[in-house]
Every structure is written in structure tokens, then in C-alpha cells.
């Protein structure tokens, strides 16, 4: 990978995590006129490493960052003042993803930045309260969205704690399949066999834990009224470039689950004809859906 080109408008901050037992870094963007505003809404953008949404050279397709997308929309009047948070939810070298889990076996890897492996508790108990305190963030106006594994984590976060968010978005999310009507994880899902998930899921896989700590089973266990209150925004790439170029089938699966729960997709189009699994397309998704998040956030301001 090329040398990261971190957007200078992204402020690095350190979060001392009681859950992880270490200090973790994240990036935060605060609009220049924040001091003129009341408490601002927050969008948490997830992927893996904290740099990914704000790195101009994250992949060769990219021509900007999430901040470029936001500031263009703000100048057009499509969104209002908004804090964006880019947390690190993987090892410091981005080789070991957490899946927004409290890892089963963090001792299996020597990668830096994992600590106890309790990333789910870090996100909910350490990071989010710290952002609210430090940046005058609105305590109820929060959105969460992600790309790829970030989409999985955004859906899981909203399913586990729908009380914390107003909207949730996923672009080409690596949504895990469930079985038995959504009561259990589908243990034959090929994604689960990837060795990069050994720390998160254990070796052999801790299936009892996986059945519970799973985006779809969590969604189906959640309070129906609470998850229906959220605005759900789901997009993914086209079927033609499956399996390596998009997560079309996983996106379709998520929409079927949401439909069974009586939840409509707020995205204008679900399967994007040119929706490759790239950062260029992730930024395009953000440009199309950030005004939808803003509409949901504005209702609680």
C-alpha cells in the first residue's frame, strides 16, 4: 500500500480505554463553525483502521476523503454542521479486525493495539462517552455507518444498541449469514473461516458466542419498536461482479431480514450498477446517503 495521506482536517485524538487496557487513537472531524453551534450530531464511520475514511491514498481508486464529501454537501446546503468520528476497530497495523466483538482469543495474535481485545466495550463504553464529553456532541443525535467489515459493524452496533442511534448505513457490508430463522450463525459461512478472524472468533470457532455476537441474530433479537425507529440505509455492488468485486448477495440478505422486520430501506437505490468494492464507491455512497442521515439526525436536534 502507498504511504497514507491523512486529511489534515482530521484531528487525531487518544482515548484511554478501560475496556482494552491500552490507549487507542481515532480521528475526529469537527466543522470549522462548531463553536457557533449548539451541541452537534455525530456520525461514526467504521471500517477497520482509523485512517481509512480520511486517507486519500487508501486505494488507487480514491480521489478524496469522507471530509471532502461532507464539506461539499455542506456547501451545497444538503447537510448541516456535523461531527464525524473515525475509530480504530482493528489492530494498530490493521491486520487483525475486531468485528466489533469482545475478542474470544486475543492472545492468538501478536499484533499491536489489541490489548484485552474488548473492542465492543471500547466502542460503547469508552469511545462514545469520550466523544460526547470532549466535543460537545449531542447525546441523542448519532448515526453509524460503514464500508465492508465496517458495514457489518455498523449493523451490529445498531442492532445491539438501537437506543444510541438515529440512523445506520452499510455500503457493500460483509453481512454474515444466519441459520434456523436467524436464531444462530451459519457456521458454514466462508467468511468465518478466514484466519484474520482467529482472535475475534477463537480457534476452533467459539460457536456459542458467535450465535449471539452476530449482526443478524442480534438484529432479530432486538426490540422491534426500537430498530424500526431507526433510519436504515443499505447499498451494495452489483451481482455481476460477485464474489470478489461486491457483496451483492449479503446486501440482498440484509434487506430481506429488514423487510421481514417491517423496515424499509431509505437508500434511493440498493444495488448500485457501478458499486465496486472500492473507496471511490464508498465515498460515492457517502455522498448519496449523508443527506439521509442528516434528515434523521435533524429530527432529534
Language model segments and positions:
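Non-catalytic cap/lid and distal C-terminal segments of serine-dependent acyl enzymes
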Residues: 1-301
